[in-house]
Regions:
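Bacterial N-terminal signal peptides that target proteins for export
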Residues: 1-10
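C-terminal motif of bacterial Sec signal peptides marking the signal peptidase cleavage site
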Residues: 20-22
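STAS-typified acidic loop motif
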Residues: 28-60
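Terminal peptide-recognition signature
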Residues: 49, 74, 118, 196
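Short, glycine-/small-residue-enriched flexible loop/hinge segments at domain edges that mediate gating
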Residues: 70-87, 101-107
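Charged, glycine-interspersed solvent-exposed loop segments at helix/strand-loop junctions
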Residues: 73, 141-207
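Glycine-rich beta-to-alpha active-site loop
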Residues: 80, 96-141
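Membrane-embedded segments
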Residues: 86-90, 96
Length: 207
């Protein structure tokens, strides 16, 4: 499955989940998932975030914090993932360094690397019906096979980049291992409110 198809699958899965949920929200979900590189729309003290986190995102976030010093929070409306892990973690660290709040709004959808970015918020809020999706990472092995994060021994150095990031964000290490086991890379696990609270992803509880 190519990256755009997977992003679409994540978005459709979230919409199906919303229609089956007992949660009733006034806001409607975006009509289309954001396949383009992540962008921010500024309204006063709020930056609304849409799109896939990629190699351009650190520069975009740096411009955001430098050129819009009044912005205090990022509302992640539709952030279905990332296609560059180091860039994602770099951009996330910029958010934490500035002390910004991150918010998943009602019917907002974030997944995969988007959840990593969310954890960078100094204060983190998930509004009613906001959706957080996680799964294992994967990479191509030397023989052309796919290596899944859940299959790599826990003491392997490949995990270090993510574990160090979560330590910096004060997110328990158990969350990283949970994401690897929750779903394979081709699928997505939509976190329950209980899981969101258990792993410390919100600072004020799920609204």
């Amino acid at each position: 499955m190519d990256s755009q198809s997977f992003v679409k699958a994540i978005f459709v899965s979230a919409l199906v989940m919303a229609t089956q949920s007992s949660c009733i929200c006034e806001r409607t979900a975006p009509k289309e998932p954001s396949f383009e590189a992540a962008v921010f729309e500024i309204e006063g003290e709020t930056a609304f975030m849409y799109g896939v986190i990629d190699h351009t995102t650190p520069g975009v976030v740096r411009a955001l914090v430098d050129e819009h010093p009044d912005v205090t929070r990022i509302v992640m409306v539709d952030v279905p993932g990332s296609d560059d892990d180091p860039a994602n973690l770099e951009a996330s660290r910029l958010v934490r360094a500035r002390g910004l709040e991150t918010v998943v709004p009602s019917n907002g959808v974030i997944a995969s690397g988007g959840v990593d970015f969310f954890t960078a918020g100094k204060n983190r809020v998930v509004e009613p019906c906001g959706k957080l999706g996680v799964h294992s990472w994967d990479e191509d092995g030397p023989d052309g096979s796919i290596i899944f994060g859940s299959e790599v021994p826990r003491d392997h150095e490949i995990h270090a980049m993510f574990l160090e990031f979560y330590r910096e964000m004060e997110i328990p290490e158990d969350f990283y291992w949970f994401t690897l086991e929750a779903a394979p890379s081709q699928r997505i696990h939509w976190m329950s409110n209980e899981e969101i609270v258990l792993y410390g992803l919100v600072t004020e509880g799920v609204q």
